[in-house]
Amino acid sequence: MKQSKLLIPTLREMPSDAQVISHALMVRAGYVRQVSAGIYAYLPLANRTIEKFKTIMREEFEKIGAVEMLAPALLTADLWRESGRYETYGEDLYKLKNRDNSDFILGPTHEETFTTLVRDAVKSYKQLPLNLYQIQSKYRDEKRPRNGLLRTREFIMKDGYSFHHNYEDLDVTYEDYRQAYEAIFTRAGLDFKGIIGDGGAMGGKDSQEFMAVTPARTDLDRWVVLDKSIASMDDIPKEVLEDIKAELAAWMISGEDTIAYSTESSYAANLEMATNEYKPSSKVAAEDALAEVETPHCKTIDEVAAFLSVDETQTIKTLLFVADNEPVVALLVGNDHINTVKLKNYLAADFLEPASEEEARAFFGAGFGSLGPVNLAQGSRIVADRKVQNLTNAVAGANKDGFHVTGVNPGRDFQAEYVDIREVKEGEMSPDGHGVLQFARGIEVGHIFKLGTRYSDSMGATILDENGRTVPIVMGCYGIGVSRILSAVIEQHARLFVNKTPKGDYRYAWGINFPKELAPFDVHLITVNVKDQVAQDLTAKLEADLMAKGYDVLTDDRNERVGSKFSDSDLIGLPIRVTVGKKAAEGIVEIKIKATGDSIEVNAENLIETLEILTKEH
């Protein structure tokens, strides 16, 4: 395909509003353009990459018996009222009315639609299982769209739904999807982890997230590609090397979530769901009597601990939440942080939010900084982290402004429900006892759920089982963020390309190093001088030969300076560059492997054979 015929509006500079490198490069390299806040047009290069990813998905889903279909994006609100999500989904839901004043939504997800279709068509267990999916645009009214394609108001998603007559059958399909997702993301060239995830608004019971890991850009060997003009990093002057490190560090590490993973086992979880190895300890110290002490101007745990000369681990942090309009007291060891997802899941609450100062004062009789679990009203619900029960003679708020209580002992002075509600910390033991926890940032690219009967119960999707009984259909849900795959791949495969000019100056610029499976084209064929007829003829022959061998070829036939052509080539990021230059009359061309910066001159007649060898090596 001729580059002059494509819409590839590259920019000379990085866009000033981009915070993450994937957003900056997608815009600068001419892959996408923003139409309005959170809404993007996918230009030809991006569309080709997305279509290649769709092909990978379709091939892997065919192996597990998943069947593609297409549901409408414009949905009647009545379906969402059936499931209860019309009122509870929140402000992200696009709501609109037609000319008859009927309520509609733009679908952010399609559980209700697929459930209705199957409910109306399937009456017996003999018609199950069904495994359906679609690839379609979704809509969420994000309050603050950001980071390019990672947080948008319109996005492309693959959502699949499976329907079963029992949980054992669901387990089989769930495992099929887990393996299919691993195959898809591996083929796409992603460094990813399958982690324990939270079902969130989807209502799932068991779930697994697939996170593209976005590591810090500190490893020069990974993030920097040297031109053939530079033998090694050791040849780069120290001051230039420092500039390169600063450029790498200047771009924010993307990733909406933190992953906690074991250094020695397969354990990995979203920080919201991560836990650690817990060993209850026996109390050895004698229990002191309660004593009220004045703690003037002490509002925080560290201030109280310093004032009373105790360690923060000997204090109790007391928080008040409102869960489905009911007050819940949450307790933590003083130096720990609350994990609201764990608390919300334990309470099985639809809504959970921190109480206001006024609500806290009405419940405890004191303001923030002086709250505690002792002498609360009869029937108060207290949920404490499991570490709290190990405390002896702890310090807690006295429910009296400016005062705390010492000698607080769980069990004697208050009763609580003990459960893991804390946020884990790096360096703690993995819950499986193997290795310690480390953190990494990640971009969620896929999520699978065991929905169970969440939607079939609320929407009356039932079948007759083998015994003639009416039972709810058991469901699974499987999503992949198709458009955000482009961001995830670029985040992992962006590179800083460094070269040395004939004058001895060092130059560096960002570009993309696309994995072969997702690159919009396989080969970038560049004619240095389009006015040289010999070079033009050789380019045309090479283009035909490459295409005949199955290569997707982007031919740069533009009448531009060679420097601009090479700069655009680095930005666009195709795996192989073939340059027809000054030696065209001799039948000599240059091959450059984008991933390594290595280049070699070959006879044009040997180009295909050489490429086959080089692509196997890389």
Curated annotation (Swiss-Prot):
Q: What is its EC number?
A: 6.1.1.15
One Pfam family from the UniProt entry? HGTP_anticodon
Gene Ontology cellular component annotations, sorted alphabetically: cytosol
Under the heading InterPro entries, the entry gives: aa-tRNA-synt_IIb, aa-tRNA-synth_II, aa-tRNA-synth_II/BPL/LPL, Anticodon-bd, Anticodon-bd_dom_sf, Pro-tRNA-ligase_IIa, Pro-tRNA-synth_IIa_bac-type, Pro-tRNA-Synthase_IIa_type1
Reaction(s) catalyzed by this protein? tRNA(Pro) + L-proline + ATP = L-prolyl-tRNA(Pro) + AMP + diphosphate
Q: Kindly list the places in or outside the cell where this protein is found, as annotated in its UniProt entry.
A: Cytoplasm
**CDD domains annotated for this entry?**
ProRS-INS, ProRS_anticodon_short
Main subcellular location: cytoplasm
Instruction: Report any one BP term from Gene Ontology.
Output: prolyl-tRNA aminoacylation
The family database entries (PROSITE patterns) matched by this protein are listed as: AA_TRNA_LIGASE_II
Provide a Gene Ontology MF annotation, just one: proline-tRNA ligase activity
Give the top-rank taxon of the lineage listed in the UniProt record for this protein: Bacteria
The protein's UniProt keywords, in alphabetical order, are: Aminoacyl-tRNA synthetase, ATP-binding, Cytoplasm, Ligase, Nucleotide-binding, Protein biosynthesis
What this chain does, per the entry, is described as: Catalyzes the attachment of proline to tRNA(Pro) in a two-step reaction: proline is first activated by ATP to form Pro-AMP and then transferred to the acceptor end of tRNA(Pro). As ProRS can inadvertently accommodate and process non-cognate amino acids such as alanine and cysteine, to avoid such errors it has two additional distinct editing activities against alanine. One activity is designated as 'pretransfer' editing and involves the tRNA(Pro)-independent hydrolysis of activated Ala-AMP.
Family, per entry: Belongs to the class-II aminoacyl-tRNA synthetase family. ProS type 1 subfamily.
Q: Give the multimer and partner information.
A: Homodimer.
> What the record says about its domains?
Consists of three domains: the N-terminal catalytic domain, the editing domain and the C-terminal anticodon-binding domain.
Which NCBIfam families does the UniProt record give? PRK09194.1, proS_fam_II
Official protein name in the record: Proline--tRNA ligase
